[in-house]
Amino acid sequence: MNYINLPTVLPGSPSKTRGQIQVILGPMFSGKSTELMRRVRRFQIAQNKCLVIKYAKDTRYSSSFSTHDRNTMDALPACLLRDVAQEALGAAVIGIDEGQFFPDIVEFCEVMANAGKTVIVAALDGTFQRKAFGSILNLVPLAESVVKLTAVCMECFREAAYTKRLGLEKEVEVIGGADKYHSVCRVCYFKKSSVQPAGPDNKENCPVLGQPGEASAVRKLFAPQQVLQHNSTN
C-alpha cells in the first residue's frame, strides 16, 4: 500500500494563530466577570497561556480578579493597558475585566487581536445614567463576538438591563458593589430611591416626558373627583 506524505502545514492555511476579540457586556450583577472567568479557564484547561488584566483602582479583592460571589483568579492590575503590553504579548489568551475603565481599550484589543491573541473583554456597556461607558462601545464593530447579559432586577425581580446608582455621587467612576448600585429593569430604573432626593436636581433617573405640560395635565384629571369627594363628605 502506498502512503501519501502530507506537508505539516497545508497550502493556504494560516501561518500563525488567528486572533479575535470577544466582548461580554451587561449591567452590574449580570455575571460578566463569571463568564469571563469561565472562558479563560476553558483555554487554561487546553494548556493555553492566559493572562487576566484587572483595573488597578478596584482594590476590593486585593490583587486578584474576583466575581461578586468571591470566585477569584490571579490577575495583573493596570490603569492603562499599554503599560502591560509586554506581558500580554507573552500570552495566547488575554482576559480584561472592567474594560470600560481603560481609556485605551479599543486600541489595545485591536493590536493584540492582530498579533494573533484571543482577547476577551468583560465590561459595563452603560453608565448609571444609561449613557455609553467610555469608549467601550467602539469595540463592538471590531469584535468577532458580542454578548449582552442581563441581571435580575434587585427591586422587582424581573429581567434587568440597567445599573442604578443608590448614592448621590455625580462622578461616572465610582467603584462599589450592592452597597452603591442595583441592577434594575426599565420600570424600576425610573422609580425614586429612598436615598435619592426628589426634585429637579435629581435628573439621573427621571423619564423624559413628551410635552412640558404632560405632568400637570395628569394632576388635573383627578381634580374633579377630589372635589366631588370633598363635597360629599360635607
From Swiss-Prot:
SUPFAM superfamilies: Glucocorticoid receptor-like (DNA-binding domain), P-loop containing nucleoside triphosphate hydrolases
Catalytic residues as annotated in Swiss-Prot or TrEMBL: 98 (proton acceptor)
GO BP annotations listed: DNA synthesis involved in mitotic DNA replication; protein homotetramerization; thymidine biosynthetic process; thymidine metabolic process
Annotated GO MF terms: ATP binding; identical protein binding; thymidine kinase activity; zinc ion binding
Predominant localisation class: cytoplasm
Record's GO cellular component terms: cytoplasm; nucleus
EC number of the protein: 2.7.1.21
Catalytic reaction annotation: thymidine + ATP = dTMP + ADP + H(+)
Residues the record lists as binding Zn(2+): 153, 156, 185, 188
PTM (free text): Phosphorylated on Ser-13 in mitosis. Phosphorylation of Ser-13 by CDK1 during mitosis reduces homotetramerization and catalytic efficiency when DNA replication is complete and intracellular TK1 is still present at a high level. Polyubiquitinated. Postmitosis, ubiquitination leads to proteasomal degradation. The KEN box sequence located at the C-terminal region targets for degradation by the anaphase promoting complex (APC/C) activated and rate-limited by FZR1.
Entry binding sites for substrate: 128, 172-176, 181
Pfam annotation, one family: TK
Role: Cell-cycle-regulated enzyme of importance in nucleotide metabolism. Catalyzes the first enzymatic step in the salvage pathway converting thymidine into thymidine monophosphate. Transcriptional regulation limits expression to the S phase of the cell cycle and transient expression coincides with the oscillation in the intracellular dTTP concentration.
Family per similarity comment: Belongs to the thymidine kinase family.
Domain notes: KEN box sequence located in the C-terminal region is required for its mitotic degradation by the APC/C-FZR1 ubiquitin ligase and interaction capability with FZR1.
Note: Two forms have been identified in animal cells, one in cytosol and one in mitochondria. Activity of the cytosolic enzyme is high in proliferating cells and peaks during the S-phase of the cell cycle; it is very low in resting cells.
Protein name in UniProt: Thymidine kinase, cytosolic
Originating species: Cricetulus griseus (Chinese hamster)
Gene: TK1
